[in-house]
Amino acid sequence: MVLSVDEFLQLRDQNPLVDVRSEGEFREGHIRDAENIPILNNDERIAVGTEYKQKGQKDAIKTGFKLVGPRLNDIIAETERVARGKELLVHCWRGGMRSSNFCQFVGMAGIKTHQLKGGYKAYRQRATEAFQKPFQFLVIGGCTGSGKSEVLRTLADKGEQVIDLEGLAHHKGSAFGALLQPPQPTTEQFQNELFEEILKLDLTKRIWVEDESIT
């Protein structure tokens, strides 16, 4: 079944999500909670792209099948591990051949799938649209180390809507930086994480954020 972005995300709590793009594309940015099972890895994707430019689509498709063939058992085994007997949510970049072929391959192994219409590109477009909506932001200001993050957590505990920008960025501002933090996400991934937080909010109500100034 082909699903819109909203339909796709609504099923995410019950169904595992698989991103079949290359590992390089996945590292640059991905949908929250997605597992990466590349149908073409970085080098293979380049090879298929080169074949497409030099010889056309038909030869590129043949090259793709030739590259995927020896790894098909491994792809299906990894997919079974991720699926755990559940139906899978699957996407590639544009909802094209990579996700379609992946769904066909694992379908022959008895794994049911749902494909994201428009792929990751549609998800990114949906995020951009969300960022254009009006927000009622209230900003907590103060010097670095003055306890802004603690105030934010207290507000969240009291039921206020909060976006923890430092938490999403894995960063504590200019003075403390990434000290004791996980690696910082790419700009694209930060945008994705911010979009995921916005999806949880009631945009008719106020939203508290923290000012990142050090003065």
Give the ranges of each region predicted by the language model.
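A conserved segment at the C-terminal end of the G1
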Residues: 103-108, 149-162
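Glycine/alanine-rich phosphate-binding loops at beta-alpha junctions
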Residues: 23, 27-77, 83
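A short glycine-rich beta-strand->turn/loop micro-motif centered on a GG-aromatic cluster
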Residues: 89, 111-124, 164-169
